[in-house]
Amino acid sequence: MNSKQRQVRRLTRRNALKILGSAIGLPVSILGVRNFASSPMLVQWHGEALGAEASLSLWHPNPRVARQAVIMIGSELRRLESIFSLYQTDSEILRLNKEGKLSLPSREFVEVLDVSTKIYNVSDRAFDPTIQPLWDLYSKHFSAERSNNATLETERIVAACKLVSFAEVEVGSQAINFSRKGMALSLNGIAQGYITDYITDLLRNEGFDNAMVEMGETRALGAAPDGQPFIVNLMNPIQPSLIDRSVSLTNEALSVSGGYGMLFSERGAHHIFDPLTGNSANRLLDVSVIAPSAVIADGLSTAIYVAGEQAAKNIIGSYPSARATLTRVDGSTIQL
């Protein structure tokens, strides 16, 4: 199989987002929902999904219906975490990582890997879900006592990189297999987007017209109840304490990728790796992508952040409905 093509057959960066209720800039938590003509009521939920902060803001004339939806969503989140979580010892992904194979994978697992395959290919391997060996290496090294600024030996990075190759993952409806012992998946760069879409679609099927879904990625169902877009404010990647950018969302999703989301060391080692070098990606400060679905926005923001500006146009061009904003290392921005 060609090493560059596969055939189908976070502390996290999410803290960079602050969801606001409508174009007037009122936080969701204090929206005056009774001011809207249809008098929808706001019901909110806050929790976690795959280790990231998660929240729902639902508007419905009958708050009991919204609360029942939240209960249903909680059950679905637990089921999805049993597939994708790296923290549940019996999850599908951990069983695959431990054994190198997984029989009868869930439909959701296969769907995420199929989306990953396309982004892996169009990004020329910049997006590679098999980077878990690098995560394990960095995490163990920098969590050791007095190693915050200790240099990670090149030989260890090179050894871990030899286990990174999504082209060597065989994906099928009956089984998923690694071709090499020691390989491991991390779907944190795309599964949260998939879950965000899943919950959004569930709400739409339950009759909701207005919702903001944050399951590690952000997706707007419809607009705010007053008909205005939802506004999402983003932090400044150079000074994370500042919020100086905003985007409007109506029936769209947003993902932001940046190394500031989780730093391993004061020297800049972080959680988004270049699978070709094994080092933390450093071509850009951050990337925000808006797309019709959160799973695409999630994968593309990671891919472009790793690949850099020169490759970004080709990557985003493969998804005509998506658009991206790149923040260069000098702080300037470019929109694609």
Please give the residue ranges for each predicted region.
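Mature catalytic core of soluble alpha/beta enzymes
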Residues: 1-336
